From Swiss-Prot:
Biological process (GO), any one: negative regulation of DNA-templated transcription
Cofactor note: Binds 1 zinc ion.
Gene: nrdR
Described purpose of this protein according to its UniProt entry: Negatively regulates transcription of bacterial ribonucleotide reductase nrd genes and operons by binding to NrdR-boxes.
InterPro entries, alphabetized: ATP-cone_dom, NrdR-like_N, RNR_NrdR-like
Family of this protein: Belongs to the NrdR family.
Protein name (database record): Transcriptional repressor NrdR
Pfam families: ATP-cone, Zn_ribbon_NrdR
Keyword Transcription regulation: yes
Needed cofactors: Zn(2+)
Molecular function in Gene Ontology: ATP binding; DNA binding; zinc ion binding
ATP-cone domain location: 49-139
Lineage: Bacteria, Pseudomonadati, Pseudomonadota, Alphaproteobacteria, Hyphomicrobiales
Entry keywords, A to Z: ATP-binding, DNA-binding, Metal-binding, Nucleotide-binding, Repressor, Transcription, Transcription regulation, Zinc, Zinc-finger
Length: 159
């Protein structure tokens, strides 16, 4: 693996351990040339996914972009980074196990909203405001009404 600091091709693995509930391997690496230390993750990729944008344009699926989107939604919220990573891994698994090589961007957004709903309500609302293209305060009000309705329903089911 190439060193991200000096571009040397000769790096050494110092530590390997399972990550993401066994879905990945986390490796700590060191570069003997510059002494730089960095972490890599090795994951199984079942198939190359392609995201079909609203415009019809097709782009390769990017797990890191998905992770960044979720991290932006949960920014400054008290959400354990491991829970975020598990949610992203779950979304990727759902997409890969669908059997399709192309997925609509709207489907990715729907899965993110589903995951955020169980992670953090504020992050859910933040993401929804962009995903659903909110224009007015009433859009937020309607979404909060949906959330409230879901909570009431959950309490009824539990009680």
């Amino acid at each position: 693996m190439r060193c991200p600091y000096c571009q040397s091709e000769d790096t050494q693995v110092k530590d390997s351990r399972p990550a993401e509930d066994g879905a990945a391997i986390r490796r700590r690496r060191v570069c003997p040339d510059c002494g730089g230390r960095f972490t890599t993750f090795e994951r199984v990729q079942l198939r190359d996914l392609v995201v079909v944008k609203k415009s019809g344009r097709k782009v390769p699926f990017d797990r890191d972009k998905l992770l960044r989107s979720v991290e932006i939604a949960v920014r400054k919220r008290n959400v354990d980074p491991e829970r975020i990573d598990r949610a992203v891994t779950g979304i990727v698994r759902q997409l890969e196990s669908s059997g399709e090589t192309e997925v609509a961007s709207g489907e990715v957004g729907r899965l993110v909203m589903e995951a955020l709903k169980s992670l953090d309500d504020v992050a859910y609302v933040r993401f929804a405001s962009v995903y659903r293209n909110f224009r007015e305060a009433k859009d937020f009000h309607e979404l909060l009404g949906e959330l409230k309705g879901d909570e009431d329903k959950s309490e009824e089911d539990a009680g």
